[in-house]
Amino acid sequence: MATKKAGGSTKNGRDSNPKMLGVKVYGGQTVTAGNIIVRQRGTEFHAGANVGMGRDHTLFATADGVVKFEVKGQFGRRYVKVETV
């Protein structure tokens, strides 16, 4: 009969998969319509002109142009817009 002491238990040993969030296109870079600009959880950045927001708060370009980030308003909200050329 094999004699092996039973192994203990642990509460560690797991991790979640990476979500690949963040800014994908920076200010001054060109985009085409449909390009993802920011992937985020919640509205860390808000959609400005020529930018749409997906159901997971992803910001994407709705027109071709150049990306511009700006801070506006009383609460310092960060907006992303696409300026058409």
UniProtKB/Swiss-Prot annotation:
Stretch list, region Disordered: 1-20
GO biological process, one term: translation
Molecular-function GO term, any one: structural constituent of ribosome
Entry-linked PANTHER family: LARGE RIBOSOMAL SUBUNIT PROTEIN BL27M, RIBOSOMAL PROTEIN L27
Species this protein is from: Acinetobacter baumannii (strain AB0057)
HAMAP family: Ribosomal_bL27 (MF_00539)
Full protein name: Large ribosomal subunit protein bL27
A Gene Ontology cellular-component term: cytosolic large ribosomal subunit
Protein family per UniProt: Belongs to the bacterial ribosomal protein bL27 family.
Record carries keyword RNA-binding: no
